[in-house]
Design a protein with these regions (language model features):
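Cation-handling catalytic/transport regions enriched in His/Asp/Glu
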Residues: 1-284
Length: 284
C-alpha cells in the first residue's frame, strides 16, 4: 500500500501501479515504486536462478538445432536476419542524445534535482491531466479509428457490445493488458482500466490485436491463422498512431496538446528506446 497527502492508505497492486506513478505527488511515486520493487528484491536469488535457467534452456535448444546462437534461433522463425537486430541496436544507440535531451526536459519541467525511475511516468503537463470513463474511452477510440473504415468500426463496436472485454481490475486478476482467443471464437481482451490517457490508448492497442485476430481467423484455415509476434504489434501500434494523430489534430487547448505530446514522447521512450535496451541486454 501507499499513502496519500492526508495519510489515507491506497492499495498498491500490479493493476494500479502505473496509475499511481502518474500521480502529481512525488512522495506517492517514490513510495509506490519502492514498495513494489522491494517485494521483488526479496526474491532476487530466485529470480536470478530462473533467468539463468531460461538462458541455459535457450542455448541448449539452439545448439541442438545447429544454430550458432539462441538469438539466431529466435530470429530465424520470423526469417529476420541478425543484421537487422544489430542495426536496430546501433541506430537506437546513435539516437541516445535525443533520449538524454528528453530526460533533461522532463527533469526541468518537473523541477527536480535528480530524475529517478519513478519520475518517468508522471505527466510533465499536470494541468491537462484528466480522468476518462470507459464509455468516454470507447467513444474516443471509435472516433480516432474512423480512417480504418466502416467494417472495422463495426467490428470494434461488436467487441464493445458483446462482452469481448474484461475491463476493470479485480482481486486475483493478472496485471497489464492482453488480447487472446481461440480459432472459431471471437477474441477476448483483458484490461485493468483506471481511466488514464494511457488506458484509453491501451484499449485502442488491444482492440487492434483482437480485430487482427478476428480477420486472420476469418480468412485463414486453422493451420495458418496464427501470426508471429514480429508482425503482431503492427496492428496495435497502428491504432495508437491513428488515435494520437486524431487527438492532436482536434485539440484546441495548448495545455492539452502539450499533455498529448508528452504522452507521445513517453510512448517513444517505452516502445523504441526501452525495448531496444532489453534487446541489447539479452545480446550481451
Amino acid at each position: 500500500a501507499v499513502h496519500d497527502a492526508e495519510g489515507k492508505e491506497i492499495p498498491l497492486t500490479h493493476g494500479n501501479y502505473i496509475a499511481l506513478l502518474e500521480n502529481q505527488n512525488r512522495d506517492i511515486l517514490k513510495e509506490a515504486f519502492e514498495n513494489l520493487y522491494s517485494v521483488y528484491k526479496q526474491f532476487s536469488n530466485t529470480l536470478s536462478a530462473a533467468f539463468g535457467a531460461n538462458v541455459k534452456q535457450a542455448v541448449f535448444y539452439a545448439k541442438a538445432r545447429n544454430y550458432t546462437s539462441s538469438r539466431q534461433s529466435s530470429l530465424s522463425g520470423n526469417e529476420v536476419p541478425e543484421s537487422v537486430y544489430d542495426n536496430l541496436v546501433a541506430s537506437v544507440r546513435k539516437s541516445l542524445p535525443l533520449l538524454h535531451r528528453y530526460a533533461s526536459l522532463r527533469k526541468k519541467l518537473l523541477g527536480v534535482e535528480e530524475l529517478h525511475m519513478y519520475d518517468l511516468y508522471v505527466p510533465m503537463v499536470a494541468e491537462a491531466d484528466r480522468h476518462y470513463t470507459f464509455e468516454e474511452a470507447k467513444d474516443i477510440v471509435k472516433t480516432g479509428l474512423a480512417p480504418m473504415g466502416e467494417e472495422y468500426l463495426g467490428l470494434l463496436q461488436e467487441g464493445f457490445d458483446n462482452r469481448w472485454i474484461d475491463i476493470y481490475e479485480n482481486e486475483g486478476k493478472r496485471s497489464g493488458a492482453y488480447s487472446w482467443g481461440v480459432y472459431g471464437c471471437h477474441p477476448y481482451v483483458l484490461l485493468n482500466f483506471h481511466g488514464t490517457l494511457n488506458d484509453v490508448f491501451t484499449l485502442a492497442h488491444e482492440m487492434g490485436h483482437s480485430i487482427h485476430t478476428w480477420y486472420s481467423n476469418k480468412n485463414q484455415s486453422y493451420t495458418y491463422s496464427g501470426y508471429k509476434i514480429f508482425v503482431a504489434e503492427v496492428a496495435s501500434t497502428c491504432n495508437e498512431a491513428l488515435l494520437i494523430r486524431h487527438l492532436l489534430k482536434n485539440s484546441k487547448d495548448k495545455q492539452e496538446k502539450a499533455y498529448l505530446l508528452n504522452y507521445f514522447l513517453e510512448s517513444f521512450r517505452g516502445t523504441l528506446f526501452r525495448q531496444t535496451m532489453f534487446a541489447e541486454f539479452e545480446q550481451k
